[in-house]
Each structure stands twice: as structure tokens, then as C-alpha cells.
Amino acid sequence: MAKGKDVRIPVLLECTACVRNGVNKESTGISRYITQKNRHNTPNRLELLKFCPYCYKHTIHGEIKK
């Protein structure tokens, strides 16, 4: 009964500041969030302002491929 592919797909968001800085020496990882996006409303890559526990501030988290 479903037509085509699902409209809402799960996406991974990764902290761009941690990736750009090569992960600060005192931090232990890279912040990642899982969320959903509607493929029809947002066909391009998703970017959201989220809190990064490794940078200790709100940074831009961009969509990455699985």
C-alpha cells in the first residue's frame, strides 16, 4: 500500500567544530545526534545548532552519511 520510499528518514548529525579542530586534546570524542528529516521539505543537508558536550558549547551539527 505504501507508495515509493519513506518520506521521513533517520539522519546522523555530527559536530562540525570537533571535526574541524581534529578533536581538542582534552576532549574524548565527537558529538553525534540522531534525528529525522522529511526528504520532500529538506532535500539538501540538514544543519542544526545543538549542544556539544566535548566543546562545552552550542555548535553547528551537520548531517553525515551512514
From Swiss-Prot:
Organism placement in taxonomy: Eukaryota, Viridiplantae, Streptophyta, Embryophyta, Tracheophyta
Keyword Ribosomal protein found: yes
Protein name: Large ribosomal subunit protein bL33c
A GO cellular component annotation in the UniProt record: ribosome
Subcellular location: Plastid, Chloroplast
GO terms of biological process kind: translation
Chief subcellular location: plastid
UniProt KW keywords: Chloroplast, Plastid, Ribonucleoprotein, Ribosomal protein
Organism expressing this protein natively: Guizotia abyssinica (Niger)
Domain of life from the UniProt record: Eukaryota
HAMAP family the record matches: Ribosomal_bL33
Tagged with keyword Hydrolase: no
Family membership: Belongs to the bacterial ribosomal protein bL33 family.
GO molecular function, one term: structural constituent of ribosome
NCBIfam families reported for this sequence: PRK00504.1, PRK00595.1, rpmG_bact
